[in-house]
């Protein structure tokens, strides 16, 4: 076994002699480098990805969107067509009539067919200082009399 002891001593000596050399020349501190980005693995990405909603959740979300859109659409439609003015039980609005003939005029016109034209001519003659300005009304009155056989 002397052989093993020799080798042991000889082996131990060289490392001891090397140690002082290393201490004499200290190494500079290593510069910190950012770690290289590891490519994403298939196992890690599935755990980090958010969970997607199921089919029923998507259908419920779509139905809610349709309901809101329908409500907004109906409200705007009623606003445009006058739904805010009183609801569906209210009477429909009557159009404004700009001209209505008096009810008593019809029998009077049957008795005197050119009464309206006469009134127009007389009103013009009273309001105008010059009768020549009322020639148009006079001409209409003459045409009415000819058409009704009164001339």
UniProtKB/Swiss-Prot annotation:
Disulfide bonds join 114-144, 124-134. Changing residue 61 to I: In PARK22; does not affect subcellular location. Keywords: Activator, Disulfide bond, Mitochondrion, Neurodegeneration, Nucleus, Parkinson disease, Parkinsonism, Transcription. GO terms for cellular component: mitochondrial intermembrane space; mitochondrion; nucleus. It is found in: Nucleus; Mitochondrion; Mitochondrion intermembrane space. GO terms for biological process: cellular response to oxidative stress; mitochondrion organization; positive regulation of mitochondrial ATP synthesis coupled electron transport; positive regulation of transcription by RNA polymerase II; regulation of cellular response to hypoxia; regulation of generation of precursor metabolites and energy. GO terms for molecular function: DNA-binding transcription factor binding; sequence-specific DNA binding. A motif (Cx9C motif 2) lies at residues 134-144. Residues 27-38 have a biased composition (Pro residues). It holds the Pfam family CHCH. Residues 10-26, 39-50, 100-111 have a biased composition (Low complexity). A motif (Cx9C motif 1) lies at residues 114-124. Its main location: nucleus. Changing residue 4 to R: May influence risk for Lewy body disorders. Changing residue 37 to V: May influence risk for Lewy body disorders. Residues 1-50, 77-111 are annotated as: Disordered. Induction: Up-regulated by hypoxia (4% oxygen) (at protein level). Interacts with RBPJ. It is linked to Parkinson disease 22: An autosomal dominant form of Parkinson disease, a complex neurodegenerative disorder characterized by bradykinesia, resting tremor, muscular rigidity and postural instability, as well as by a clinically significant response to treatment with levodopa. The pathology involves the loss of dopaminergic neurons in the substantia nigra and the presence of Lewy bodies (intraneuronal accumulations of aggregated proteins), in surviving neurons in various areas of the brain. This is Coiled-coil-helix-coiled-coil-helix domain-containing protein 2. It comes from Homo sapiens.
